[in-house]
Design a protein with these regions (language model features):
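Acidic (Asp/Glu)-rich catalytic clusters
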Residues: 3-7, 29-40, 60-71, 149-150, ...
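Alpha-helix-loop-beta-strand connector modules within alpha/beta enzyme cores
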Residues: 23-46, 50, 98-101, 105, ...
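An alpha-helical appendage that flanks or caps ligand/catalytic pockets
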Residues: 88-125, 166-167, 171, 175-279
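Active-site-adjacent beta->alpha loops and helix N-cap segments on the catalytic face
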Residues: 22-31, 161-176, 295-299
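N-terminal beta1-alpha1-beta2 module of alpha/beta enzyme domains
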Residues: 1-43, 133
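Hydrophobic faces of well-ordered beta-strands that scaffold small-molecule active sites
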Residues: 13-15, 41-44, 71-75, 135-138, ...
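Conserved, mostly hydrophobic/aromatic
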Residues: 5, 9, 32, 63, ...
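Active-site mouth loops of central-metabolism enzymes
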Residues: 46-53, 129-140, 193-196, 256-268
């Protein structure tokens, strides 16, 4: 698959680390690095809860030894799949401290830290690592967006596709960057969904990720004007630890909301949405395909991109 993605012309391959819901990303990214020569390879995303920051530094450094400057570390606070481990997403301070510790370890420093979520005692890597390995932060809520603007090399933006909403999110990133006295980092927007000429099928396949927003990032429901009663009902019926398990909650959402928050339509519709995102000012657009035929959506996304 990695070879096909590279041959198709994609620039990035991101793999998730989602506790029990996905295979280990570092092993798969190492295989992808061996099979490709151009693809940028990263986690989207790991977190400081299921993996100690020191072990994340080791894993990222190892990937960089294999993939060279194509390696990227994507990290976030964690999400609902942590529930299966009896854990909760990291608090903002814990995420910020983890990023700082990882960077210091990659730079060859000895690190002692006593943070809310982890401890390090004179810890240092026993091998050389890439101090300049890019760190991308996954963000959706306003405070995490501001943190990403302040400290990240790139932002993995999870906010749907509505241009006004994306601008709102970018403003939060810019606020954080401005306070830190630095330019806006790279903006990598992630869009989930299905591209199919059968639009009802595409909408049905994308409903599950649309239900993620009322549960995890409800501010976007307010920004696009979703009825608060629908938001409440979706939150109450969202029972799965992973968005793919949220079928009952997703069925409550109107089509208009699904198509603003996810890729859910035919090639013409998606091409128009990609053109709007280009105008907003994101640096890269990344598709996370859903549905039964994910490769079909990847290929359709490539067709849409080539129309621009």
């Amino acid at each position: 698959m990695a070879r096909h993605i590279e041959a198709t012309g994609f620039d990035n391959l991101w793999l998730t680390e989602s506790s029990l819901h996905a295979r280990d990303p570092y092993q798969l990214l190492a295989l992808a690095a061996r099979a490709t020569t151009q693809l940028r390879l990263g986690t989207a995303v790991t977190n400081p809860v299921t993996r100690h920051p020191a072990l994340t530094a080791v894993a990222a450094a190892t990937l960089a030894e294999i993939a060279g400057d194509r390696a990227v570390l994507g990290i976030g606070a964690g999400d609902r799949p942590l529930m299966a481990l009896g854990a909760k997403p990291a608090r903002l301070a814990e995420l910020e401290a983890a990023i700082a510790a990882i960077r210091r370890l990659l730079a060859g420093e000895s690190v002692t830290a006593d943070e809310p979520g982890f401890r390090l005692v004179d810890a240092h890597l026993r091998f050389d690592a890439r101090a300049d390995l890019p760190v991308f932060v996954s963000a959706s809520g306003p405070r995490t967006l501001e943190l990403a603007g302040a400290v990240a090399d790139g932002v993995i933006l999870l906010c749907g596709l509505d241009p006004a909403v994306v601008r709102w999110a970018l403003d939060r990133v810019d606020e954080g960057a401005s306070r830190a006295g630095r330019p806006r980092p790279h903006i990598a927007i992630f869009v989930y969904g299905v591209i199919d000429e059968d639009e009802p099928a595409a909408i049905a396949g994308a409903r599950s990720i649309a239900a993620w927003f009322p549960q995890t990032a409800p501010i976007y429901c307010d920004l696009v004007g979703l009825d608060p009663e629908i938001t409440r009902a979706v939150r109450e019926s969202y029972s799965g630890g992973e968005f793919q398990e949220a079928a009952q909650a997703a069925s409550l959402l109107p089509v208009s909301f699904v198509q603003r928050m996810a890729v859910a339509g035919n090639r013409d519709r998606v091409t128009a949405q990609l053109a709007e995102l280009q105008q907003v000012g994101v640096d890269s657009i990344n598709i996370l395909p859903l549905g039964d035929d994910r490769m079909a959506t990847i290929n359709a996304f490539d067709e849409c991109w080539r129309r621009l």
